[in-house]
Structures are given as C-alpha cells and as structure tokens.
Swiss-Prot record:
GO terms for molecular function: agmatine deiminase activity; protein-arginine deiminase activity. This is Putative agmatine deiminase. One of its GO terms (biological process) is putrescine biosynthetic process. Its EC number is 3.5.3.12. The gene is aguA.
Amino acid sequence: MAKRIVGSTPKQDGFRMPGEFEPQEKVWMIWPERPDNWRDGGKPVQEAFTNVAKAISQFTPMNVVVSQQQFQNCRRQLPPEITVYEMSNNDAWVRDCGPSFVINDHGEIRGVDWTFNAWGGLVDGLYFPWDQDDLVAQKICEIEHVDSYRTDDFVLEGGSFHVDGQGTVLTTEMCLLSEGRNPQLSKEAIEQKLCDYLNVEKVLWLGDGIDPEETNGHVDDVACFIAPGEVACIYTEDQNSPFYEAAQDAYQRLLKMTDAKGRQLKVHKLCCPVKNVTIKGSFKIDFVEGTMPREDGDICIASYMNFLITNDGVIVPQYGDENDHLALEQVQTMFPDKKIVGVNTVEVVYGGGNIHCITQQEPKR
C-alpha cells in the first residue's frame, strides 16, 4: 500500500530528487484526447505521442495512463511492451501534474505530489476544472506502492524546475513568482519549499521563460542540467526570434552561476529553430469557454531544449526546420555516450508543450 507522509519533508527524511541523467526505472505519459486543445479530436497528436513513447521504450520501460473512453484506442495504438493503465485526467501533461520522485541511499523511493492548478488557477490557468489532473500524482504513487508527500499549501509543476541531484535546482522567476501560483509566499519562502521537498541547498534563478501565455515561463524550454556542473541553454543571435531576449538573458546569467558544490557551470549552447512554428488549422480545435483559445498564426513554443534524457538515450523534438539536424548534433555533443533520437512534435507544440512536458521519469530505486 501507499501512504501519505505528514509532518515531514524529503529533506528531513534523507530523500533527494535525482538528476534526469541518473538511471531510470520507467517513464510515464498521459494519453491526449481533449478536442478543445488538440486538433482533429486529438488524432494527429496521438500519433506523435505514440512515436515519443516508442522512442523512449528503446531505452526505458514505458507506462501510459488513459481515460476510460480512450483505453481501447490507446491500447491498440501502442505496442504491447508499453503498459497502459486506465486513469481519469483533464489533459496530458504528466510532467506537471504527475509526481516528482525522490530517492534515498537505501534503495527507497517516494513521490512528491505538488498541488496542481493548471498553470495559474482562476488567475490565468489554461483550463477549468483541473481536479482530475491534481489526483494523477497520488494515483501513480498508488500504482507503484510509493509513499508520497502532498504540498497542499504550495503549487508547483514539474516542468518549472530542473535539479542536478547534488543540491542545486534551476528555475525561473517568471513562473515561480507568478500571481496564479503562490502569491502568499515570498521568494525566500518559495526557495525554502524547493529546498525542503527536492532536498537542495541552492536555487539558481533565471528571469523569463519563453512561454508567458502557456505556463508563465517553464524552465524546461530554456535550460536544463545535463550532468553535475553542466547545463544546456537555448541560444540564438537572431534578434527577430521571439525567444531572443529570454535566451540571451538566461545564457548570460548561467555563465556567472555556480552550483551548490561551488562549481562554475559549464554552459552548452543549443540552437533555436530558424523559422517560427505557428498554429495552422485552429478551426479543427473545439472552442470551449474557460479553455485557452488557439488561433491560426499563434507562435508556438518550439524549443529543442524540451527533450527527455532517459538512460542511454535522449529524445529530442523536431519541427521540419532547417536547424533540426544541428540540434541533434549539438545534443549528441552534450551526450557522446547516448543515442540521440529525434521525433517530430509539431502537433504537440500546437497544444502548448513538448517531449519533456508530456513525460515524467521514475528513477531507479
């Protein structure tokens, strides 16, 4: 059985969140279906999710959760080696509503169940209701027989931070200090929450993310740890790029930062697409009051940074852009001992996310 842990934190109990580059037991996804977020009733994006899941399963066992209505369709589209569970949900962003797993030095694992409010709640959230998404982390922990910590007084999404597993967390001011999440907490109080529940000693703050309308600037589109003391950061010198200012600011900040161990960060550049990815065929997306509308010509958050590191592989977004191959080469340089797999995720970015957003790794115990 899985129980809730009250009156304590992972830090007090000797649990830490490992870096994404550390060994993984499995990866989780949620099957997409919302017709008010995905084109053509979700059919094109289901193909993209399937391709992402297949790519990951080359390196790590895959679990996919899906609503009752879509169970048979999901099961038919995914190969038999991928496990499928029925689970109610509001949408498909398991990085943000799923558990952040923490481990200790004795082979034990627990989950952190952050309060989820659809990226801003009633202030600027993307949809309502979000109650089923807020239960996903607890349900996954139940399936895995993993005890969990619930942060009832603290809203956070998994895509808003990256850890190095050695005491450092990377995040953005735009997201964590936004009005729709924890307006009752100071920046210092938010830092303390991160330290307590991720078991870190140092918080590295970037400024803005590149998606103010979607997630208020999640860091996983901008930068991530690729190894202890090493980070990747999006980079462009094209001043016409919608990502230029945020990318330049993040890169310059990272160059001056040290981690919790006192190491000067080594910063690797990762290119941006040459052309903007813009929404096409928005008439194929149902309009529903209370859900963020999507219009033709809207610029999507097409970042190569939103990749997933998983055991011996790295799964990287592709957009049919002339920089696709360069991005794969740059990621290969960052991970010389891993296989780099590109997957076209245009349909995913139409809905507001990417590979890292739709996956959640479970570390080895």
